[in-house]
Structure formats: structure tokens, C-alpha cells
């Protein structure tokens, strides 16, 4: 083992002694390019108060504009899903549909628990329908308009298109920034609800803080 390590070290040594001018120039050019790209990302929507440009994992360190837009597309989509999840969580806590969810399983909507616990109650056929619907959305609905901003899923038409087009560019940018912030908060929020549900079956921490009692599942 020691011999193998020494052999690798000796083989690498010539490259460590004297870096060529070409390599140095390439590194300098690469550093300048990365710095320029980072500066361009700092002016993108989403680099805003209170954190500004925040990339602790370095996902954009070597990204080009296409890479950035791919990540932004994913962020917007996940944010929208998380906002729907928060709304669904709160709705399920306070209201249930009437009738039966599954006659074969003798399961009514009122019998379904809220949150993560619902996954263990949904019949296999129901889970299959959910995954099929998600696949349909992914393949046919949530497709970005070519040449538009990340998150523009209006290929099939936009019922609010007229009001959106009537807005100024500044207003449109503000709306997109608000959606990003709300989506980020919702992603953290739904994660917190799931964690606290698993910890003590009391996901609504704010209710506990203000003394508002509730029964969860």
C-alpha cells in the first residue's frame, strides 16, 4: 500500500513543481469568467433582501446562464408545489369532503388523517392515480414557454394573460420576486410541518405559542 502511494506521489510530482504558463493563464481566465457570471447572477430576480445573493452550496460556482435558468425553473416549480402543500395541509385540518374516498376499502374522506400520516392510509389504487397525475403534469403541463422566463408554464394559454401583459416590466419583476420569496418560505414551512408532525404530532407551532388549542389527527 505504501509503495502504491509513493508511486502516485512521484507521478504527480512533476506537475507540482513547475506549472506551465498555459495552465496559469487558463486558471486566470476561468476565475475571471466565474466572477463575471456570479456578478450577472447577483442582478437576477431572487437575489433580494434579506439575504441578497445567497449560494452557500456553490451551485452556481461554475454555472452558465442555461444552468442558472434550469435551477431557477426547478426552484419556482418546487415553490409552487410547496405553497399548494401548505394550503392543502391547512384545508385538510379544518375541512373534509363528504362521502367515501374508497368503497372497496370502506374509507371515507373524514377517516383520512392529515399530513404525512395520510400516505399510509391511501389505498394503492389511489397512490397510483396520484403518481399518474403528477406524471401528466410533469410531462404535459409544467413545460416552460420557449424563450420566456423560468416558470412560465402558459403553453396551453393563460386565463390571466391580458392582465399580466398590461403590467409594466417593473411590476412583472416584482410579482415574480414575491412568488419566489413565498415559494421559498413555503418550502421551509411544509418541511417544518412534516418534521413537527413526526416529532410530537403537533405541527402547528404558532398555535402552541399563542395558546390556541387544536386537535391534529
Curated annotation (Swiss-Prot):
It is a multi-pass membrane protein. GO terms for biological process: photosynthesis, light harvesting. Keywords: Chlorophyll, Chloroplast, Chromophore, Light-harvesting polypeptide, Membrane, Photosynthesis, Photosystem II, Plastid, Thylakoid, Transit peptide, Transmembrane, Transmembrane helix. Pfam families: Chloroa_b-bind. The LHC complex of chromophytic algae is composed of fucoxanthin, chlorophyll A and C bound non-covalently by fucoxanthin chlorophyll proteins (FCPs). The ratio of pigments in this LHC is; fucoxanthin: chlorophyll C: chlorophyll A; (0.6-1): (0.1-0.3): (1). Belongs to the fucoxanthin chlorophyll protein family. This is Fucoxanthin-chlorophyll a-c binding protein A, chloroplastic. The lineage of its organism: Eukaryota, Sar, Stramenopiles, Ochrophyta, PX clade. The gene is FCPA.
Amino acid at each position: 500500500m505504501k509503495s502504491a502511494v509513493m508511486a502516485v506521489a512521484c507521478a504527480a510530482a512533476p506537475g507540482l513543481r513547475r506549472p506551465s504558463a498555459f495552465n496559469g493563464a487558463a486558471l486566470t481566465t476561468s476565475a475571471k469568467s466565474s466572477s463575471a457570471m456570479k456578478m450577472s447572477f447577483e442582478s437576477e430576480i431572487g437575489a433580494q433582501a434579506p439575504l441578497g445573493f445567497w449560494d452557500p452550496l456553490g451551485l452556481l460556482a461554475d454555472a452558465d446562464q442555461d444552468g442558472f435558468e434550469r435551477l431557477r425553473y426547478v426552484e419556482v416549480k418546487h415553490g409552487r408545489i410547496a405553497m399548494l402543500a401548505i394550503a392543502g395541509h391547512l384545508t385538510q385540518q379544518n375541512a373534509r369532503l363528504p362521502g367515501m374516498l374508497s368503497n372497496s376499502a370502506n374509507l371515507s374522506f373524514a377517516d383520512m388523517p392529515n399530513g404525512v400520516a395520510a400516505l399510509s392510509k391511501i389505498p394503492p389504487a389511489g397512490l397510483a392515480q396520484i403518481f399518474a397525475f403528477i406524471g401528466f403534469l410533469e410531462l404535459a403541463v409544467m413545460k416552460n414557454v420557449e424563450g420566456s422566463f423560468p416558470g412560465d408554464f402558459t403553453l396551453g394559454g393563460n386565463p390571466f394573460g391580458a392582465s399580466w401583459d398590461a403590467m409594466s416590466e417593473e411590476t412583472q419583476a416584482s410579482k415574480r420576486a414575491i412568488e419566489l420569496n413565498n415559494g421559498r418560505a413555503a418550502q421551509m414551512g411544509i418541511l417544518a410541518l412534516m418534521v413537527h408532525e413526526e416529532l410530537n404530532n403537533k405541527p402547528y407551532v404558532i398555535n402552541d405559542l399563542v395558546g390556541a388549542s387544536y386537535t391534529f389527527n
